[in-house]
Amino acid sequence: MVGRTIKKWWPVFVLPTFAAFVIGFLWPFIWGIYLSFCKFTTVQDVTFVGFSNYSKILLDSTFSHSFWLTVVFAFVSSILINVLAFFIALALTKGYRGTNAFRTVFFMPNLIGGIVLGYIWQTLLNGLLSKWGQPLLSLSAKNGFIGMLILLMWQQIGYMMIIYIAGLNNVSPDLIEAAQIDGATSRLILFKIKIPMIMPSVTICTFLTLTNGFKMFDQNLSLTGGDPGKQSQLLALNIYDTFYARSGPQWKGIGQAKAVVFFVLVVVIALIQLRATSSKEVQQ
């Protein structure tokens, strides 16, 4: 009876969600791709220009710099965050006293907004750099890059730690006990049992950290603003700067084209990463 009712009325329940998906995501997405082939000031003042916007991207030195800076930043931040989060999770699953308090402390930075974090860390890091006689974040591309790494690591390590803790807690104690009986060392247990068994967690955390690194915007805006001379400007901020900070209808279309390229880049790298890490997962 219930099954027949669901079969009869399921479109009524699906329709609101589907309509929200089409209106809120699908239609803006398709329209955004079309606008990347146009020059415009508003959506009612659109002129089709073909691939002109995409060809101009290739000649934009700020875009190419932001592109490669973002790729390096995303991979470096992903590696550092995952390695540190895993070893912190490993330490916090040993049953030491105060473990829950440490978990809470490590997770709390994830609850703070990116803009607020950017200004907080800007004050902290500039104070330290000034004391040490080093260039401020806005005056050194190297210091700005390192500052963004520190900020993102501080913000996200706690969240990834929770995922790794969940994975480590699901590793069967029987497997570890059997390995210990067979004379396996702690190092061997870590690399041959624990890490292979938590590969689903590694897949999730790597995906999240990679995509977060690629699309980082608010922290970049508030911490360095892309200074000096846009040398610390990541791709999301470069797109924003192109779309809003430059005048003229051609820049709107170029900014939209950059956004499409950015979307394709993130999707391709995320799919490659998911395939690579998923293939290492152990069937339980």
Regions found by a protein language model. Name each.
Residues 3-284:
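A structural signal for multi-pass alpha-helical bundles of membrane permease subunits
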